[in-house]
Curated annotation (Swiss-Prot):
One family name in Pfam for this protein: PD40
Organism: Chlamydia abortus (strain DSM 27085 / S26/3)
Signal peptide: 1-20
GO cellular component: periplasmic space
InterPro entries noted in UniProt: 6-blade_b-propeller_TolB-like, PD40
Keywords per UniProt: Periplasm, Signal
UniProt name for this protein: Protein TolB homolog
UniProt xrefs under NCBIfam families: PRK01029.1 (NF002183)
Record-stated family: Belongs to the TolB family.
Compartments (UniProt record): Periplasm
Length: 427
């Protein structure tokens, strides 16, 4: 809806779209940012409202800048002269966003109503920024997603004894618990389907690890499989309605597939698609169309990445990376063009990316701290991962565009297994 409104507005300026074609960004490329001037117009004399609106405007500007394609800056009213100018106009509690090209007249493009819920207001600002980002660049904004992760505050003997799942915004805001199970909950994975933003995770609350279904609206997860043994590392394909996971139901940690839907749950019996002849398997991740899986196997002695075609017919797995011999945690990008993963390089686990088009891989991080669990934002150009040594771990954002990292400041405790998702479907 917003994009149609913007196109109509641009037609008045004699411009169809400044960035109609998606910006193709390679792993090590730089792009010039589009300057954006932002004006804040407050129609209230209430000091507390003015302060609050200024904080929301700061959030909005940071949101626009997050994707590394726009260069927004706050300017005084009437001094805008950038290629595009945005006004954030407040008649409390309503906020209207208007857009103008150069010195042309502003056109309204989005509006929202503030509530008494500060977290909800922040989310509304995130969503407004992402919609405007998409309209200007044809690339999804990434500020409105949620990062879910496992937070432990009682690490002992170099092992996580207990950890609950939490969610947080990219900037550390809106931090809140998702589970209250007094157990160890790990490896959350967004399902990217449904309005309730469901996710899968593994919990030890029954003593051994089992796969559960959770959502942002419910703090109690539901066990989804009735299979003996341990189950780990769930991944879901919304296109194929398939759940991939690892289980030792037959003795060896093997890769399984299970038909699954939110309405019907598990459908039929799970299929073991690889057995012990392919070593110990782990970390499955679907391609966006659900036709392939990337996973880890140690069949050659060390953990390495393999790709398995599962549709239209099952083929034998093929080795993905030959450069690195100790790899784990693969994550397929939403655009289907890249796979992020971890590899031990000079004794340290680093974040790398494999380009499926060129067959080349790149090392993205170099600091002497172990990293794990890369997870993509919806734009396929930004990652979240955890990094730390024994007894400590923090979350970091990584831009493939700028090659820069940024720590998400949350507080005490070990933060592991991040998953970035929950993005609105209407960008």
């Amino acid at each position: 809806m917003l994009r149609r409104m913007l196109v109509s507005a641009f037609l008045m300026f004699g411009i169809i779209s400044l960035y109609a074609k998606e910006l193709e960004v390679s792993v090590r490329s730089e792009i010039s940012r589009l300057p954006i001037h932002v004006e804040l117009k407050i129609g209230s004399n209430d000091a507390s409202q003015q302060k609050y609106l200024r904080s929301l405007c700061t959030t909005f500007i940071n949101d626009l800048a997050l994707g590394d394609r726009l260069q927004p800056s706050l300017v005084q009213t009437g001094s805008s002269s950038a290629p595009f100018n945005i006004a954030m106009v407040s008649h409390y509690p309503e906020i209207t966003f208007t857009l103008a090209r150069g010195t042309q007249n502003h056109q309204p493009v989005h509006s929202l109503m503030l509530t008494e819920d500060n977290a909800l207001n922040r989310q509304k600002i995130h969503e407004a920024a992402d919609k405007i980002h998409y309209a200007l660049t044809s690339v999804p904004g990434i500020s409105s997603g949620k990062i879910i992760f496992s937070l432990s505050k009682n690490s002992q003997d170099c092992e996580l004894k207990q950890g609950e799942l939490w969610s947080v915004d990219y900037d550390g805001g809106n931090l809140r618990p998702l589970t209250q199970e007094n157990s160890l909950s790990i490896t959350p994975s967004w399902m990217h389907i449904g309005s309730k933003k469901p996710y899968l995770y593994v919990s030890y609350k029954f003593g051994i690890p089992k796969i559960f279904l959770g959502s942002l609206e419910n703090t109690t997860g539901k066990k989804i499989l009735h299979l003996q043994g341990n189950q780990f590392m769930p991944a879901f394909s919304p296109r194929k309605k398939l759940l991939a996971f690892i289980s030792d139901a037959y003795g060896n940690p093997d890769l399984f597939l299970q038909s699954f839907s939110l309405s019907q749950g598990a459908m039929g019996k799970p299929r073991r698609i690889l057995n012990e002849t392919f070593g110990t398997q782990g970390n499955p991740s679907f391609s966006p169309d659900g036709s392939k899986l990337v996973f880890v196997s140690n069949k050659d002695g060390r953990p390495r990445l393999y790709i398995l075609q599962i549709d239209p017919e099952m083929l034998s797995p093929r080795l993905l990376t030959k450069k690195y011999r100790n790899s784990s945690c693969p994550s397929w990008s939403p655009d289907g063009k890249k796979i992020a993963f971890c590899s031990v390089i000079k004794g340290v686990r680093q974040i790398c990316v494999y380009d499926l088009a060129t067959g080349k891989d790149y090392q993205l991080t170099t600091t002497p701290v172990d990293k794990e669990g890369p997870s993509w934002a919806v734009d396929s150009q930004h990652l979240v991962y955890s990094a730390g040594n024994t007894g400590e771990s923090e979350l970091y954002l990584l831009s493939l565009i700028t090659q820069k990292t940024k720590k998400i400041v949350i507080g005490l405790g070990e933060k592991r297994f991040p998953s970035w998702g929950g993005f609105p479907d209407n960008q």
